[in-house]
Amino acid sequence: MAANEHGGKLLEVSGLTMDFGGLRAIDDVGLDIFAGEIVALIGPNGAGKTTFFNCVTGIYEPTLGEVRIHPPGGASRRINGMKPNRITALGMARTFQNIRLFPAMTVLENVMIGRHCRTSTSIVDAILGSRKAAREEQECVEKSYQLLKKVGLAEVAGEFSRNLAYGAQRRLEIARALATDPFLLLLDEPAAGMNPQETHELDALITRIRDEEKVAILLIEHDMKLVMNISDRIYVMEYGKKIAQGTPQEIKENPKVIEAYLGEEAHA
């Protein structure tokens, strides 16, 4: 398996193509993610970025191409056609462009929902209140609370998620995704709607997740300051095609990217 300066390959996407009727939303896109990386996927609205995420995470089955994961210490596996919950259980988690929390549940309970894919308690054990069920529930609470501390939400663990400010809800979604113990985390526009201070805090949080949790990150984002600050590599899409890939500096200087997305001001 290939490796770069960070580590072994975790995600390998080749020839990914997605058709909706007569519309080709993604056209022959390839992408690799390696251990220890933060990688950004950028491009104009409608470029196909979220559709790409949906194909990789099992919401859509690609028309053509292959999506393959290489879990650390595990066997390489083709995941085309797998259900999203199965892909999550294999170690690839995501957040969504539109926040998808459970508003009538507490902040802690929202994270615990994510953690339950790592428990093995049966329905019978849960109903009977077995020792195993009690032990796993306590472990779930403790793990979830630790994740809330990591994202700065431990003090509001008992609040309903609907009462959180927008930026805090974004961080709660990240905590819930981390509760699944992923080796790769996909973030779909995590800074959307955030003010500059919240975006600055998110910048630090994403880097901490990579460094402390040993989780690689693939993110879609329009905030170019955030992208350029934290990314090891960047892929650029336009009209469903990949038009460039490289380091932040290479992307800043790429004429195709400047014309399609960044503009001359970003290059200056």
Residue ranges and their predicted role:
Residues 2-268:
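Glycine-rich phosphate-binding loops of nucleotide-dependent enzymes
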